[in-house]
Amino acid sequence: MVVMAFGKPKGSCYRKQVEAKRLSLDELCVYKETPRQWMKQLLDAARMAPSSMNSQPWRFVVFDSRIHIFSKKHPSDKLGKWDEVNFGIMFANMMTAAEEMWLDVDLIRLDELSQKNFQNNQYVLSAILRP
């Protein structure tokens, strides 16, 4: 269900940045090496993507010019059922940012990761970047 409101707001149309309560990159990412600045900008665009109930289900493992993207496993299916939509929005944010930075990105599914069983996360895709 999608809800749209019409009319004029009583206060500001925008919430304050502190109210967004986004997780930091350090909470979302595991870095195998220090990432370059353009990689951090791309990850930040993904981090800022809206998600249902602010669930922010994405987790990233960053190595060289690769980002392995995982979905946080949910204790209940209530939030998990929206993950496809949430990830679609996050990928759109990431790809838009990559295009703005003139980066080539291939989204691929790696068999060696998709067949592994991870305790708290589920493998989704990998982003291979070519600056």
What are these language model-derived features?
Residues 1-131:
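Acidic, surface-exposed loops and disordered segments
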